[in-house]
From Swiss-Prot:
Its EC number is 3.1.-.-. Its cofactor is Zn(2+). It is found in: Cytoplasm. Transmembrane segments: none annotated. InterPro entries: MetalPrtase_cat_dom_sf_prd, YbeY. GO terms for molecular function: metalloendopeptidase activity; RNA endonuclease activity; zinc ion binding. Its main location: cytoplasm. The lineage of its organism: Bacteria, Pseudomonadati, Thermodesulfobacteriota, Desulfuromonadia, Geobacterales. It is an enzyme of class 3 (hydrolase). Belongs to the endoribonuclease YbeY family. One of its GO terms (biological process) is rRNA processing. This is Endoribonuclease YbeY.
Length: 150
C-alpha cells in the first residue's frame, strides 16, 4: 500500500505520518490493501483553484476527489485509486462549527474523499446511495476511533 501525502499549507499543523496511517487503515477497511493513493492538504486558495479548473465552481470546498478508475485510461493501473485534496482551512472552520477537533474533521474528510474514489456517492446517485455512503462513513470512522487513530 502506498499513500503519498503532500502538505501544501502551513497554517494548520498536520502530522503526515499519522495521517498516512489513517489513510492506510481506511483503505484496509474498504478492502484495498494493495492500492495507491495521493493526498494533498492545501488551503482555501488552493482548493478553490482546483474546484474552479476541474469542477467549474469558483469557491473553496472541504474535499475534492479524483478517481483514477474514471476516464479513458482508468483500467491501466487499477491499484492506483486516485487523489484526495482537502482544504485545511475549511476543515478547521467546520471543526469549530461542529464542536470537534481539527484532527477529527480532517480524518473524516479524508475518509469521505476515499469513499468517493472507491465508488461511493451522495450527490448524483440518489437517497439510497447517500444513506449507504453515510453508513459506511459511520462504520469506518468508528473503527478509526476504536483504534485511537482519531
Amino acid at each position: 500500500m502506498k499513500v503519498a501525502i503532500a502538505n501544501r499549507q502551513r497554517r494548520h499543523p498536520i502530522g503526515t505520518p499519522r495521517l498516512r496511517k489513517v489513510a492506510e487503515r481506511i483503505l484496509s477497511a474498504l478492502g484495498y490493501p494493495d492500492s495507491e493513493l495521493s493526498v494533498v492538504i492545501t488551503g482555501d486558495l488552493g482548493i478553490r483553484r482546483v474546484n474552479r479548473e476541474y469542477l467549474h465552481k469558483d469557491r473553496p470546498t472541504n474535499v475534492i476527489s479524483f478517481a483514477m478508475a474514471e476516464g479513458e485510461f482508468g483500467a491501466l493501473n487499477p491499484a492506483m485509486l486516485g487523489d484526495v485534496i482537502i482544504s485545511a482551512d475549511t476543515a478547521a472552520r467546520e471543526a469549530e462549527e461542529g464542536g470537534v477537533s481539527f484532527w477529527s474533521r480532517l480524518c473524516f474528510l479524508l475518509l469521505h474523499g476515499i469513499l468517493h474514489i472507491t465508488g461511493y456517492d451522495h450527490e448524483r446517485s440518489g437517497e439510497a446511495e447517500a444513506r449507504r455512503m453515510e453508513a459506511k462513513e459511520r462504520e469506518i470512522f468508528a473503527i478509526l476511533e476504536r483504534e485511537g487513530l482519531v
